[in-house]
Amino acid sequence: MAIHYETKATNVGGRKGHVYTDDRALDIDIVPPAQADGKATNPEQLFAAGYASCFNGAFDLILKQNKVRDAHPEVTLTVRLEDDPDSESPKLSVSIDATIKNVISQEEAEKYLQMAHEFCPYSKATQGNINVDLNVNVVD
């Protein structure tokens, strides 16, 4: 199996620590969500940023493969840390909210959003592990 890309991130101190990538493109303090101060981040924000970027790339690709031009997709991904009734530790859930320009119907947009969900590596990694809500809004 061919590896398309590999990266490394190192954390020291857990949720009250620091994380950096091997190339130092990301080099930031980590704090628990309740202590967010705008100068540090948390694992949930990093997950949301990565998943939103990956998913929007997949959505844009699916649209282009299906000859949909000028859709200008935008994806907002909400990550929730919530109680897990089956465990003492919390669990994640995700909402993916996409917006595209009014170049296709709502029905087509929903179909392509689902295709992107099946294609996106983050979606594949989380499949069956977390609840994911998909929403798309076609706007003028």
Curated annotation (Swiss-Prot):
One of its GO terms (biological process) is response to oxidative stress. Disulfide bonds: none annotated. It comes from the Bacteria. PANTHER family: ORGANIC HYDROPEROXIDE RESISTANCE PROTEIN-LIKE. Belongs to the OsmC/Ohr family. This is Organic hydroperoxide resistance protein-like. It comes from Staphylococcus aureus (strain MRSA252). The lineage of its organism: Bacteria, Bacillati, Bacillota, Bacilli, Bacillales.
